[in-house]
């Protein structure tokens, strides 16, 4: 019965897989609790703090942990388990709109966090719970086993007076799939401009080729390998595929690039992270690039 289900549901799985990949490549699994006062980011991956009195950020969160059914009255039939932990800034509507956009998509930007979460759950139900006309021919027990899941969380990697670096983590499984999908989407906010920071804001025109070489070089050091061949053979990472993807965190030490499943390595390798110190990027920085603020004076 499972095999026939997989065949029937191939198109639905492909759609869900596409949605997952698009969500991760769009404008983003530990959850950070809300905080009302913060200290300056120290560069740790879990930093949520800011110490400056006039730049203090207050945080709030919405947590959803529930299962949604095709038949909510009886709680029977196809279902989707949804776990959402949404951390967002309080008291700054522009930042809230950016966080909504990062986490849920462009069309959610102008909603309140509560409205955004509620609408997102409705969309998840539509995409991950099978409609009745697609479940004909199955017993009630078969339908009860048609379970999908979606977990969505965001995390603050680093905060200071210049930037907020946010990671969105999405994990999905669509019933009938061989395996689930997971990955991260990073967004960086220019705190003064209330705008999203892209590679084009940081680096000179035509930066891609030089940045690719830098990333490939630091991939070796990140994984403790001496040659590209060794990295490919021992780690399964295709060095020639490593290129800028606008998916990076910023902190006071450097940039960490994230590559999701299948980007530069097979599924089994998992997510790949490459750290590049700010000093290695001096040659391709745009004049007045925000990253100059993190360089020692001798390199500026």
Where are these regions (language model features)?
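Bacterial Sec-dependent N-terminal signal peptides
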Residues: 1-48
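Compositionally biased intrinsically disordered regions enriched in Thr/Gly
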Residues: 36-300
